[in-house]
Amino acid sequence: MQSSPKVLPKQQMAKFGFNGWTLWALYITGLVMVPILTVATLALFPTENIWPHLLNTTLPRYFRTTVSLMVSVGLGAAVVGTVTAWLIARYRFVGAGWLEWALLMPLAIPAYVGAYALVDLLEYAGPVQTALRGMFGWETARDYWFPEIRSFPAACFVLTFALYPYVYLLARAAFRDQSSASDDVAKSLGRGAFARFWRIGLPLARPAIAAGAAIVMMETVNDFGTVDYFAVQTLTTGIFSVWLQSGNAGGAAQLACVILAVIILLVSLEKSARRRMKFFNLSTWHRGVEKTQLTGRRGVIAFTLCALPVVIGFVIPTSVLGWHALNHLDEWTNPALIKALLNTLRVATIAALITVFAGVVMVYGVRLARSETPKRLLPITSIGYAAPGAVLGVGILIPLAWFDNRLADGIWELTGHDIGLILTGTSAAIIYAYCVRFFAIAQGAADAAMGRVSPNLANAARSLGRNRLQTLKEVYLPLMSGSVGSALLLVFVDCVKELPATLLLRPFNYNTLATLVHEQASLENLSQAAPASLYIICVGLLAALLLAKTNK
């Protein structure tokens, strides 16, 4: 009896449309999804189920506060971003040129840094209240009324002026892309500037504004430093309380799942809005709206409306921190600051390189696959960017701690040598969290760049005897270098600014710039937090300048 021919692994993979690159893409997908799957598993099968207790006590309050904060900041950012985008896109006035990119500068400052600066400026012992007491002869806080600084409205205020550039960026592009035809018709019917904005410009830009507002709300849910400093109890602060104070990982995972449900809803809203954005340029003839010159009082009003968000979101926080830094120059040589700076540069650089490398490999592997399965998995990996850092912290620490302990126990039994915790006891866990959190940035940049390369170039390289790796190195990468470089910068900047995941995953006595700022500000030592904050702002400005350059 003749035996059937032996099927080799490569032949089996080819049968299903897979190859080595495709398998690497699947491995990367699995690594990105591990934290999310861990959170879901731990929430469904907790060691100690405190869900009924959470449901009857703190969860409703956490949820109400989170939704209220999310909606308030989303609406505030939508108003600020839309008004400034309309003025920049449709009018010419003194200062409009530099305000066009200056309106992006608040993105350089993490919201928690802006919160620390605002409190320092406006608190009872701050310069504003001190000046008021001196001016009017007031002696104590009972002699006058002043808004409570560490409060829910203050958190909304800070987050709004830190995050509005997301709306501004998308709305400005939408207003610019609108055809002049509808605007000309409205003018011929005698409609004024406000009527044209309200009846034509705003409805056409609504999908872009909704997409920007959804991103703002996702960032609001992710925020920890601001709400923690203002004592606003949200779902994110609840994760820290339940896990670190109560020691219940299952309860923290259940709260994390609630956050994920909110995030999935927001992502769906953002995706739906982006799909509707395609109606902007359906006309075969397209001419942009010509800008109107504003002079006199109208020009001053337009300048003021556009300059105010820059002053609140960037100038004031930077000035407060700069004043502290200049008055405490010795803090710049503080060993703790230098160590935190080196830690930040190391983990952010490693994470950026790994993330972008993995993004390129995954996109290339998916493109080489003849099966549709890997292509369907590609959008799933972007969930890490939507998931808050606190959620990823829960999903990463638990499996890594389990692996660390098993590995250490096994090596101890075999060799009698204690290797310690090689993942959770070092910065490896932080780097992994950064890679998962910002993988979507690298993947999106690689996918867009690779999509612009003609398949004929790759086919020509293969016909000349180049293998898949050589084709990637000699054809794709040189043509993708600009996008890859931008992705490296954006991932690096986001890693420097990331706070929640770093707080949960850092080893003992390990600080990055973000955690050092949070630590010192929590102790009311803003003078010690100022140099680290300014380092973060300088790095963030690189990303803001890149966005300004790529969105001219």
Predicted features and spans:
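Feature of multi-pass inner-membrane transport and sensor proteins
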Residues: 2-7, 132, 179-180, 195, ...
